[in-house]
């Protein structure tokens, strides 16, 4: 339930997760679960809405923040590659429509935190 509360707070602006008093072990479990499900950046957004005394240890926050930075860099790389690909197709007279991951990420409070895998696009032409 804690993972879902944090995830919900991460994708809904204004929501504050109703959790508190979690042990270090429980926070590590949440980190592992969020990472394995590909939602660690979204859960991080929920954690940042918690009062400082309810957040995980400094050590885990630093580890989590580093992971989120890595996700943000990857997102930036994906956006640049998608733009390069669309430009190459446009040069050949083919219009490109980006689908799913990158396109849907624009609907999230922090688009860079929406997990994206591969690039799905539709070629018109």
Feature roles, as predicted:
Residues 1-11:
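Charged, compositionally biased N-terminal leader segments and the immediate start
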